Amino acid sequence: MTNKNAYAQSGVDVEAGYEVVERIKKHVARTERAGVMGALGGFGGMFDLSKTGVKEPVLISGTDGVGTKLMLAIKYDKHDTIGQDCVAMCVNDIIAAGAEPLYFLDYVATGKNEPAKLEQVVAGVAEGCVQAGAALIGGETAEMPGMYGEDDYDLAGFAVGVAEKSQIIDGSKVVEGDVLLGLVSSGIHSNGYSLVRRVFADYTGEEVLPELEGKKLKEVLLEPTRIYVKAVLPLIKEELVNGIAHITGGGFIENVPRMFADDLAAEIDESKVPVLPIFKALEKYGQIKHEEMFEIFNMGVGLMLAVSPENVERVKELLDEAVYEIGRIVKKENESVIIK
């Protein structure tokens, strides 16, 4: 005779899994958009591409996680924004290629299925999807006792977007003389946290460091990653942008060259970069070499645009936010990124 409790005895709570599905339905409903087909719970998410109105559609996809920022979410028991980080990391990548996000899927793996906690995680994913204009059309929650500790979980996501074939941004339009515009980040975003955790390993998170302008350390460290989709899409539609770099792991040095050809370089005026207080604190308390900061972090610029000089004012007008002219594209001599 089959023991009905056998799976539970091995550490997998099927009933908790059902509860998670019920809890997240209202959050998923917030992300509904034209093109979504079917309901949550099917074997595959469906999307009608014809509803986008794109004449020559090219699908662009991206996948990412949030790295060890998750460890701070677990440490501080704050799980309602880490999902936004996951969405941001994916959709900011595909917007850099000129794609409008259409839909998103998430994957959560955990040692113990705690419905209330996982609802918070998915609520954050849904909020990110709303900000990106993407539908959350599916996902997976895997309870994996023995693989993860009871309080541990991992989170990854997958975004799919669409671009008009003629509006794809692949770096081929970036030329010498283009102006580099920086869009401010919300903070560290979701990269460099192995170093961040080492720097602040002996802190509780409740500290209010003088550099952080009255905010608690944990609030600054868990500030969700900014989603740039709604700010940048109008620029793409008007074909005002030649190149876009999402400044993630590897900072300026690794990511900026990804938006132009090998014979070009980015010359950046450091005095024009809007360095956020958290980066000054990290450099000070971590005793990190100043030049290395630009090899690791976004330094206050989460997205960089390469724009023809004649389009700069129109771009600023459409963005309607602080936009920083931080440099220009030059002919490459030695380095791909020159910070002066």
From Swiss-Prot:
InterPro entries: PurM-like_C_dom, PurM-like_C_sf, PurM-like_N, PurM-like_N_sf, PurM_cligase. Keywords: ATP-binding, Cytoplasm, Ligase, Nucleotide-binding, Purine biosynthesis. Gene3D superfamilies: PurM-like C-terminal domain, PurM-like, N-terminal domain. Its main location: cytoplasm. It comes from the Bacteria. GO terms for biological process: 'de novo' IMP biosynthetic process; adenine biosynthetic process; purine nucleotide biosynthetic process. The keyword Cytoplasm applies. Its EC number is 6.3.3.1. One of its GO terms (cellular component) is cytosol. Pfam families: AIRS, AIRS_C. It is found in: Cytoplasm. It catalyses: 2-formamido-N(1)-(5-O-phospho-beta-D-ribosyl)acetamidine + ATP = 5-amino-1-(5-phospho-beta-D-ribosyl)imidazole + ADP + phosphate + H(+). The keyword Nucleotide-binding applies. Pathway: Purine metabolism; IMP biosynthesis via de novo pathway; 5-amino-1-(5-phospho-D-ribosyl)imidazole from N(2)-formyl-N(1)-(5-phospho-D-ribosyl)glycinamide: step 2/2. Belongs to the AIR synthase family. This is Phosphoribosylformylglycinamidine cyclo-ligase. It comes from Streptococcus pneumoniae (strain ATCC BAA-255 / R6).
